[in-house]
């Protein structure tokens, strides 16, 4: 629908893909698609087998992992600074993760600041947001929490 809506307004390009495809029209599908990139075979397909798939260039330094940072099965974007623990998550560009933060099974979009002692699980945090120190956001029983400007939306 969106491609048809903007076809005469914007330059739209696409790739013919034979194996992996996902519609991201719902929050659950968006979450699942991002989490699929934690699988080595999906990353290999898009970034090695199809080397002409590009990301937006933003001349950022590589992610910085400070002493005590722990990252397991996660993707961390350039320009990010990690001071806490990240597990099974996708962290976009220019994200600051404060001291003693824990992020699990979540997607953190661009330009997010997570204050010290923050706990995030099963969440999607919108771009350009600040999550205050000493806060906890958890989606439970398959419910994803979308955090936008410190407002929570359960989906």
Where are the model-predicted features located?
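Left-handed beta-helix
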Residues: 1-155
